[in-house]
Amino acid sequence: MSDRYELFLTCPKGLEGLLLEEAGNLGLEEAREHTSAIRGVAEMETAYRLCLWSRLANRVLLVLKRFPIQDAESLYEGVLEVDWFEHLEPNGSLAVEFSGNGSGIDNTHFGALKVKDAIVDKLRQKDGTRPSIDKLNPDMRVHLRLDRGEAILSLDLSGHSLHQRGYRLQQGAAPLKENLAAAVLLRAGWPRIAAEGGALADPMCGVG
């Protein structure tokens, strides 16, 4: 694999411009806006930096492969060709997320099943050991997006959605996700206000 990787960062719709600026400041290059996402290239160090410091992204996806598909079998074969031993031990756990439709795949559950089957079949080639499925806390989370006959296969570097920072084990329900709250502050010019010595009090800030 090369030293630079294609990355997709997902976000709530309408925050693409803010995320584009934030990700550029964190080192993402050749960044472009998409619907509810941005796309760019970066070294792995930058990918980890985005996972750690982005306040606006939901997920950071590292693109492993793009390939055309005509039907479910070509989807399976395309995923099977990836060297999954580089990413997961045969006795590890995985979760698969699938979005999009077309090329004979009109059900996301069926598409995810074909992706899962290909990964499992690849990993059990060595000695028959196969990974388990864990949708809550997998060792590897894979995402495949189907767009007009092209499959975009990615590793989810962020695990859980990045708005779930998890530093508080007990929390009450909040009206805003943390990344959306951060976007509201940016739109309101809070960084400038704070730099000028301004103060902010929010007695209903949820997890902060």
Segments (PLM) and residue ranges:
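A residue-level signal for conserved active-site and pocket-lining positions in enzyme catalytic cores
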Residues: 96, 144, 184
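Non-catalytic nucleic-acid substrate-recognition regions in nucleic-acid-modifying enzymes
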Residues: 2-140
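SAM-dependent Rossmann-like transferase core, predominantly class I methyltransferases
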Residues: 153-191
